[in-house]
Amino acid sequence: LGGGNHFIEIQEDENGMACIMLHSGSRMFGNMIGQYFNKIAHEMNDKYFSTVPSEYNLPFLPVDTDEGQRYLNWMNLAMDFAFENREVMLEKVKHIFTEQVEKYTGITPNYSDEINCHHNYAALENHYGESVWVHRKGAAEGEVAIIPGSMGSNSYIVRGMGKAESFLTSSHGAGRNYSRTGAKEKFSVESVMVDLRQRNVVLGKTSKKDVAEECRF
């Protein structure tokens, strides 16, 4: 599953239906791919005399080079890994959920369609009549997407409206008012836990020391 803002959550929608939502990705596998090719991109930008200042940490990989094609292949593999990772975890959660519901209610739950969307990737798309690479970081293609809320706040299933200005993209999260460090400095563990209890949120997390990082404040 991973740490940080990754989670598995049982929710209730506006119609009183139970929902399972989880957030995870390619884990260290994807991170290592990104770091490896980011280093290569820095070296290539020095070679090509890139006009982008190195302190911006935005080196590029020309897609018509061997290095660029290798990155695309590895990125797609990481995306496939992330997709399957979420699928496997969701199946395990559904299995446990079904067992417990049947045990305590005698009812076998039925599951509706699933939504599984990527949120860190690049894709070749057509916008404004041009073929361009769209980089989505913490964002999702705005068809049917998921916007998870902070702990104790609402999450949303959304359908894109086809806004060209956003390159047909939706956000993939609630955003932040504070950095993780800033949130821990401003809000105590106790205050976050009191807020969650008041909102009838059960947090099944052994260590609570970092809960302020993802609180709704």
Spans of features found by a protein language model:
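Domain-length cofactor-binding catalytic modules of enzymes
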Residues: 1-217
